[in-house]
């Protein structure tokens, strides 16, 4: 990022950056700068950092002040000082050392570059899956790797004249004997002439192939091939069908990749580097610790490795005229491996380690992962109006509500509470209002509840992998220090109530509050955005709770005395007929569900205890052919007919006086919850119409 780019961000207040491939011209524009005397600087040619005697940056090194700017504002490498921003007609740079008199903060964004002696493929586009280079070229990744790392050569298909290798009948890739025999019989100049005409190897071959691609033709041919494969239909051979399916998936990825390159105006050959950018020094610092020892970023050592190997290759190509071509190819391979290690250490096998057997941190290690530049430094910062706490289950909450601890709520909504105290003339100024909040006066909690009633909050659980990872809730005050959450929203957050933590955010602007209410409320996100299946479904403890609530007798769900299909109970009835003769009489009778629940709360009956509940049952539902299991006469002349799941009380004249169903308190609780839910749904539908 150069100064113009940085100022552009500040001027237009851009809130986003795009990471992608750039052209060599763009890299040169970012890194090169023209001094007032007309000299162009920016290329890093030496692998040195600081001079061991003067402790000053080496010229044209990784910390050069001519390239990256002065270490101290307005002070050049010679020690001269100029006032920054002085409009006198004085030179803006030191004529002796060539350092500009500018602010030292320029070292945070001024980049340099390394001019590579040979093209180098970007390992992210070659080795990361899916391989973009392999997809565009429609070639196996293994063969491309062998070509990049000079394991074999490639007959140049773009030669206008008949080449020796083509006349020999070679097609695309050379046999192993040619790999070793060709370079040995040519000096550097002769080998270059031969290679430029006959063969191509290394990243240069990849660059030529990518430069010859026509993305529009790739789109047309890939789409046509996909249609032809789709029209063929299944062959009946499972192996062939799988092969066709994989080919169709590959064609889809290739089309999408080509469309992306066209849409973003990126040329495929930019995936092969000719100029390697050098990070600003402040992003890869060398610091001095106690005892005079220096600590350096691992990236500096990886840059030094690249420069050493690149300079060696440059010397082989320019000065040593008798060097065998095989040595040149080996050195090109070493440069490629050094750049690979700089970008992604360990992607090709064993990572590079230092003298203490510690793996060097490459670019990928610096920016990716939880401790990377993006998640820790840019996205992981603490923000205002936010909090964090452990989540616990709140079964009594509504789906769109969450319990917010008082300590967190008073901190998050403190400004709103202060405004409420002043508006209601309960505090004369902000200081008095804060004093009332610190003393936790009762009026504060009342105003806090009033503020929270109309203000949603956002709950977020990291990592936020999809949109259900952050949802809106209506907060209510709860005791304790944990956030209470409805168990049905657990799956959307992928959370468990075993110590997971969640962050709380307060939307401040009206737009954010409207978005939270219209799009992000939990009761409006009941379906999975990926597959459309219900995501708020009972699981684990809820299913076990429903089982216990409705199972009845703890001996099992089939342990019903009046179940005629339970053979064990039928035998027990024969054995203990006298003992259980009046057992149903001992089971309590209730006129309504409120009396039954009241008896349970008074601990007169248990949750699974069977009872008789008076019920308005349609007589048409009673099967006329069903015979009663038992019958008993009451003391008042009534007659009780006991069926499988209900009881009919008749008068002497056989008239039905009342009907009771045999149930438990657990069934009553479940029925009431379902009834309330249905009534609420019907009321919402009627209000909507």
UniProtKB/Swiss-Prot annotation:
Keyword flag Cell membrane: no
Residues annotated as binding Zn(2+) are 76, 78, 94, 97
What SUPFAM superfamilies is this protein classified in? beta and beta-prime subunits of DNA dependent RNA-polymerase
Question: In the record, what terms sit under GO molecular function?
Answer: DNA binding; DNA-directed RNA polymerase activity; magnesium ion binding; zinc ion binding
Q: Which reaction does it catalyse?
A: RNA(n) + a ribonucleoside 5'-triphosphate = RNA(n+1) + diphosphate
Main location as per UniProt: plastid
Enzyme class per UniProt: transferase
Compartments in which it is found: Plastid, Chloroplast
Q: What does this protein do?
A: DNA-dependent RNA polymerase catalyzes the transcription of DNA into RNA using the four ribonucleoside triphosphates as substrates.
Name by which UniProt lists this protein: DNA-directed RNA polymerase subunit beta'
- Which species is listed as the source? Populus trichocarpa
